[in-house]
């Protein structure tokens, strides 16, 4: 009988100990240079953002996309069979709505100062790597220089869009559909493809 009681006590002790070892779920940490893609983490000493800088950038991008979608819904939908002239008219109408809705927008609203520092450090780090000269050559291929741009401006129709080097593109935070990164000179712009509008930009991302 005493032996049975000892077994019961031992079993209860094991159960209690096992329960104590269970870990409580952890909250998801904000995205930073440490949790971003490997390419970003490699240059953590160059332009390292504070906690949540990339997360804040993503949040501001999402806010812009929500606004654009809301405004786009007020326009008549254009069918796939629309003529280039009709598509251009729709694009310009959307740009006008977006520009009016964010009339007070300025450079640095989406790419905030710490994010700008982070982007500059990232791009300069990639260009300083062993494939830097090749990437720079790709970066400058058909890259328009000396072009004036401003937030809420339409991307110039006479200027070809530069090709984004895969190494640079892979290191930057991913963007939602219809938003793209593009270079205009040594400025990295955030382009709304649907409205053909410059959402924001970062100056002097590399030396020319």
Regions found by a protein language model. Give the residues of each.
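Short, low-complexity, intrinsically disordered N-terminal modules
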Residues: 17-18, 29
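Post-signal peptide N-terminal segment of mature Sec-exported envelope proteins
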Residues: 27-52, 56
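Early exported N-terminus immediately downstream of N-terminal targeting peptides
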Residues: 50-114
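Bacterial N-terminal signal peptides
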Residues: 8-17
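Amphipathic, charged alpha-helical segments and their helix-to-coil junctions
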Residues: 136-208
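Bacterial signal peptide processing site
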Residues: 19-23
């Amino acid at each position: 009988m005493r032996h049975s009681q000892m077994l019961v006590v031992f079993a209860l002790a094991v159960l209690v100990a096992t329960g104590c070892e269970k870990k409580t779920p952890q909250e998801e940490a904000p995205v930073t240079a440490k949790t971003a893609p490997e390419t970003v983490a490699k240059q953590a000493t160059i332009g390292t953002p504070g906690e949540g800088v990339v997360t804040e950038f993503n949040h501001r991008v999402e806010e812009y996309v929500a606004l654009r979608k809301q405004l786009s819904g007020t326009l008549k939908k254009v069918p796939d069979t629309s003529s280039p002239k009709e598509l251009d008219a729709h694009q310009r109408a959307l740009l006008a709505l977006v520009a009016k809705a964010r009339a007070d927008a300025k450079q640095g609203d989406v790419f905030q100062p710490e994010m700008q520092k982070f982007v500059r450090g990232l791009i300069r780090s990639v260009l300083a790597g062993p494939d830097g000269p090749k990437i720079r050559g790709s970066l400058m291929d058909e890259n328009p220089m000396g072009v004036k741009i401003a937030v809420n401006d339409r991307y110039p129709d006479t200027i070809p869009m530069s090709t984004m080097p895969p190494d640079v593109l892979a290191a930057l935070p991913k963007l939602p559909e219809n938003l793209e990164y593009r270079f205009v000179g040594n400025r990295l712009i955030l382009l709304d493809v649907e409205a053909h509008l410059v959402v924001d930009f970062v100056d002097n991302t590399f030396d020319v």
